[in-house]
């Protein structure tokens, strides 16, 4: 009966598509975690332009930022712009952390994303510090020790309304460690959250990224 109503039919199809996308995401996350835990995950390293990568990451969320009227600031402050990294995994790490900030930051609030270069003890390598700080709902002191556990989510009224599996940060932490990096989180409930990731990469040249064009 309801299928005769076009609006209702579109609503049902939308729910089916959302459920299918969520299921596919869960399957992919479980497979990725299995690869990491079994030691079969490998890094696909190549020369990359960090300016271009950072721009791609930030443009992904333009529509979500507009819809929630968020004050979104993205800053890149590096001297070395070309590095050897796993582009896909580095993007996924940034996308996941920024996506969480957007999901848990109320309308009209702010998010500040930054990549800056830190001092490296190895002259052939550079350190990038990626940070994402929001004025969102934050996390309780009791939950923070469990933030990277598989299938872990804080049970609050707001948290329960946001779709997710609780696998994301667990996988992201494993990816970061696979890349030789580290991640830290600071959070206060009702005030906001800040994730900080410390990466180290081999330095590349512009020619390695773009050839002789």
List the model feature ranges, each with a label.
Residues 34-45:
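Helix-loop junction within the histidine kinase core
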Residues 163, 168, 172:
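Short alpha-helical Gxxx[C/S/T] motif in the catalytic ATP-binding
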Residues 139-151:
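Short conserved segment of the HATPase_c
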Residues 44-49, 66, 71-81, 118:
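Conserved catalytic submotifs in the C-terminal HATPase_c
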Residues 18-23:
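Short alpha-helical segment of the dimerization/phosphotransfer core of two-component systems
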Residues 101-102:
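Short helix-loop "hinge" at the ATP-lid/N-box region of the Bergerat-fold HATPase_c
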């Amino acid at each position: 009966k309801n299928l005769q109503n076009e609006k209702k039919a579109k609503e049902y199809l939308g729910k089916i598509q959302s459920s299918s996308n969520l299921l596919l995401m869960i399957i992919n996350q479980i497979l990725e975690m299995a690869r990491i835990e079994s030691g079969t995950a490998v890094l696909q390293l190549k020369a990359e332009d960090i300016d271009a990568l950072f721009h791609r990451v930030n443009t992904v969320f333009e529509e979500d930022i507009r819809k929630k009227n968020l004050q979104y600031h993205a800053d890149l402050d590096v001297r070395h712009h070309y590095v050897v990294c796993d582009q896909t995994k580095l993007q996924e790490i940034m996308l996941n952390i920024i996506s969480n900030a957007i999901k848990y930051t109320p309308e009209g609030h702010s998010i500040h994303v930054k990549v800056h270069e830190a001092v490296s003890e190895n002259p052939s390598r550079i350190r990038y510090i990626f940070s994402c700080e929001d004025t969102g709902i934050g996390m309780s002191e009791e939950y923070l020790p469990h933030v990277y556990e598989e299938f872990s989510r804080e049970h609050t009224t707001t948290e329960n309304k946001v779709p997710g599996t609780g696998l994301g940060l667990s996988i992201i932490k494993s990816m970061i460690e696979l890349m030789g990096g580290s991640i830290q989180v600071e959070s206060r409930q009702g005030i906001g959250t800040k994730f900080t990731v410390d990466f180290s990469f081999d330095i590349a040249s512009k020619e390695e990224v773009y050839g002789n064009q």
